[in-house]
């Protein structure tokens, strides 16, 4: 019994001792300092409550996250990513939800003259059954001596088909189908003169049409002119560029000229013959007044005769002829042009207005000016990262109009 009592007393003393008044003495030379203190009990629930009160609400933390997302941190971080998600829409894919990771980085963080490299990872799913994932980017090596531009993506898209040529897109009834598309493309460039590059391009693409809406009537075969519903092609080519743009995704000044010749060998696909494609781009950017950029774009693509339907030039996408259903007007060749005024309005918010035109045709000797289609529209911009914009455009065309939500400037 005495032992139990001693143990209980010892336990009580050990628990109560921290809360009892304690005396300490410090001696310094001939002086002695005596003091007595009593530790106060700590209320753990109050401390936790204060911590919870100091924690910002989710919405405020989200605002803080995006407030700093447009600051250039490429000199202090290996790669500076910003993540975003929200609704997406285009005339081709309808309403959906998109996720995006936009990153900026520098391979040489001691080089403050060269523009940073960029990469975008994206995923999208829509109520119409679209799903797509991919990555695209531009890697700029030290002192901009070399460049690597790349795109890797897969998409499954319910689409409409009108056939080939201006008259088909204008007057035919659409046939619905699902298009599965795989694309891998890389363009490696080497600087040979100031702002002048030459390089090679390598691409692989596979497209398959499935679930045609009129399979019983087989009228879609008329639109395909007897071609197969699936094609695979591997492209090899040469690129020559002149590029004085200050930043590829969103230039404020400079000129960009690109000429590319690509061949698709018969033995590296199932197209049945060797094909070729010629592409030309000419872009110019000039500041016209404070925070306002005037941008111009000329684009042309020419495919060889007998190019399969999935590889034809398709008018209307998130870069050119915005507002048209992509592929309603399709043919061997296409020429488009547009001029856009880009104005920063307040802090990270801006707006745009543009106008342009486009034409699809089978060959230059069959080009018809009366088949030229108009295009114009306006847009809203929000700076997600330093000079990387999220854009909402509304484009108008001939008997058509549509919203478009995307990332980076159209050109």
Regions found by a protein language model. Give the residues of each.
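Bacterial Sec-dependent N-terminal signal peptides
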Residues: 1-27
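Outer-membrane beta-barrel initiation region
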Residues: 23-149, 227-251, 343-351, 360-362, ...
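Gram-negative/organellar outer-membrane beta-barrel architecture
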Residues: 73-82, 89-228, 232, 389, ...
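Transmembrane beta-strand segments that form the barrel wall of outer-membrane beta-barrel proteins
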Residues: 80-89, 114-127, 133, 255-267, ...
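Transmembrane beta-strands of outer-membrane beta-barrel proteins
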Residues: 81-83, 117-121, 147-152, 197-200, ...
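Residues on the lipid-exposed face of transmembrane beta-strands in outer-membrane beta-barrel proteins
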Residues: 85-87, 99-103, 135-139, 184-190, ...
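C-terminal outer-membrane beta-barrel translocator/porin domains of Gram-negative envelope proteins
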Residues: 236, 241, 245-344
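Outer membrane beta-barrel transmembrane domains
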Residues: 303-391
């Amino acid at each position: 019994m005495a032992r139990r009592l001693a143990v209980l007393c010892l336990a009580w003393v050990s628990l109560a001792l921290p809360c009892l008044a304690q005396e300490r003495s410090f001696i310094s030379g001939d002086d002695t300092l005596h003091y007595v203190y009593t530790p106060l009990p700590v209320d753990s629930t109050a401390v936790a409550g204060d911590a919870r009160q100091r924690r910002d609400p989710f919405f405020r933390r989200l605002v803080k996250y995006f407030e700093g997302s447009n600051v250039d941190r490429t000199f202090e971080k290996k790669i500076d990513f910003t993540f975003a998600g929200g609704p997406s829409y285009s005339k081709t894919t309808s309403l959906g939800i998109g996720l995006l990771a936009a990153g900026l980085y520098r391979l040489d963080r001691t080089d403050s003259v060269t523009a940073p490299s960029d990469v975008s990872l994206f995923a999208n799913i829509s109520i119409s059954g679209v799903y797509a994932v991919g990555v695209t980017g531009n890697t700029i090596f030290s002192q901009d001596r070399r460049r690597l531009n790349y795109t890797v993506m897969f998409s499954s898209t319910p689409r409409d088909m009108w056939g080939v040529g201006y008259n088909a897109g204008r007057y035919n009834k659409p046939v619905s189908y699902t298009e599965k598309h795989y694309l891998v493309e890389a363009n490696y460039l080497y600087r040979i003169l100031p702002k002048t590059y030459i390089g090679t391009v390598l691409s692989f693409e596979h497209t398959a049409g499935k679930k045609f809406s009129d399979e019983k009537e087989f009228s879609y075969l008329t639109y395909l002119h007897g071609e197969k519903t699936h094609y695979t092609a591997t492209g090899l080519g040469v690129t020559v560029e002149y590029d004085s743009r200050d930043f590829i995704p969103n230039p404020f000044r400079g000129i960009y000229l690109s000429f590319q010749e690509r061949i698709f060998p018969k033995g590296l696909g199932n197209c049945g013959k060797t094909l070729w494609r010629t592409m030309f781009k000419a872009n110019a950017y000039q500041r016209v007044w404070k925070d306002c950029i005037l941008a111009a774009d000329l684009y042309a693509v020419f495919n060889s005769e007998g190019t399969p339907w999935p590889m034809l030039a398709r008018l209307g996408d998130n870069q050119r002829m915005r507002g048209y259903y992509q592929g309603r007007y399709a043919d061997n060749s296409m020429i488009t042009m547009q001029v856009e005024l880009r104005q920063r309005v307040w802090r990270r918010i801006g707006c745009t207005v543009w106008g342009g035109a486009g034409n699809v045709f089978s060959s230059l000797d069959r080009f018809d000016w009366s088949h030229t289609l108009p295009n114009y529209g306006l847009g809203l911009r929000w700076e997600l990262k330093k000079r990387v914009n999220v854009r909402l455009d509304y484009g108008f065309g001939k008997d058509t109009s549509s919203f478009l939500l995307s990332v980076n400037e159209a050109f």
